[in-house]
């Protein structure tokens, strides 16, 4: 048997779901609140499975588990807002990521209504007002294709990331001519121990 045949046979073995989830936990991802409001009701959830599809026309991809409490409202309303989170949003991210009642989730932030009717977090790094234009079922999830109809960038915080089941922060890149981030701050962003002082306690979602 050749090496090529051995590799092909190995690749045909199904990947264990737990092993796949563990591997995916090592990917650092931006953290977003996906929110909606309309005839189907108000709802929202925390997501990291968000990415750009195209800039012409501007389109985002959002994945949602069909077992999510937000699924019915989101698909019935047909609109949503992608709110990208920054440092300081760990609490609201955890609330939207658990089994917290809807009213308590939205009570944790300050919101404004977008033209689509979706709620936008006022201090999000950026909010994308979207209309769902396509949907495709894959396994337990639906992949939503979302046409971006408006963008609002307002927050100035460092980016919030999720990696190894913990929230972490990524400092904003310094502007041209400005000093780089101090070592202690850079260490906190990486979840490492700063040169001086205690290590930052990173909370799991």
Swiss-Prot record:
The record's annotation in InterPro entries points to: Flavin_Rdtase-like_dom, NADH-dep_flavin_reductase, RutF, Split_barrel_FMN-bd
UniProt enzyme class = oxidoreductase
Q: Which reaction does it catalyse?
A: FMNH2 + NAD(+) = FMN + NADH + 2 H(+)
Under SMART domains, the record lists:
Flavin_Reduct
Top-rank lineage group of the source organism: Bacteria
Keyword Flavoprotein listed? The answer is: yes
Look up the EC number in the record and give it.
1.5.1.42
The UniProt keywords, alphabetically, are: Flavoprotein, FMN, NAD, Oxidoreductase
What is any one GO biological process for this UniProt entry? nitrogen utilization
Residue ranges for the region (Disordered) are 171-205
**Where in the sequence is the signal peptide annotated?**
none
Q: Annotated Gene Ontology MF terms?
A: FMN binding; FMN reductase (NADH) activity; FMN reductase [NAD(P)H] activity; riboflavin reductase (NADPH) activity
Q: NAD: present as a keyword of the record? A: yes
Q: What does this protein do?
A: Catalyzes the reduction of FMN to FMNH2 which is used to reduce pyrimidine by RutA via the Rut pathway.
Homology family: Belongs to the non-flavoprotein flavin reductase family. RutF subfamily.
Q: By what name is this protein known?
A: FMN reductase (NADH) RutF
* Species whose genome carries this gene: Methylorubrum extorquens (strain DSM 6343 / CIP 106787 / DM4)
């Amino acid at each position: 048997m050749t090496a090529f045949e051995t590799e092909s046979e190995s690749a045909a073995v199904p990947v264990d779901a737990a092993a796949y989830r563990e591997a995916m936990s090592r990917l650092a991802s931006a953290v977003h609140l996906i929110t909606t409001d309309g005839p189907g009701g108000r709802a929202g959830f925390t997501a990291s499975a968000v990415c750009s599809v195209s800039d012409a026309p501007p389109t985002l991809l959002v994945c949602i588990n069909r077992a999510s409490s937000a699924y019915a409202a989101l698909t019935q309303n047909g609109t949503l807002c992608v709110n990208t989170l920054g440092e300081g949003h760990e609490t609201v991210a955890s609330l939207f990521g658990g089994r917290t009642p809807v009213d308590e989730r939205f009570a944790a932030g300050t919101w404004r209504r977008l033209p689509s009717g979706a709620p936008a977090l006022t201090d999000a790094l950026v909010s994308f007002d979207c209309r769902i234009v396509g949907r495709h079922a894959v396994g337990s999830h639906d992949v939503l294709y979302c046409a971006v109809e408006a963008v609002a960038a307002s927050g100035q915080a460092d980016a919030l990331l999720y990696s190894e089941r913990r929230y972490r922060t990524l400092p904003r890149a310094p502007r041209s001519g400005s000093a780089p981030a101090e070592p202690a701050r850079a260490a906190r962003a990486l979840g490492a121990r700063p040169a001086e002082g205690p290590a930052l306690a990173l909370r799991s979602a």
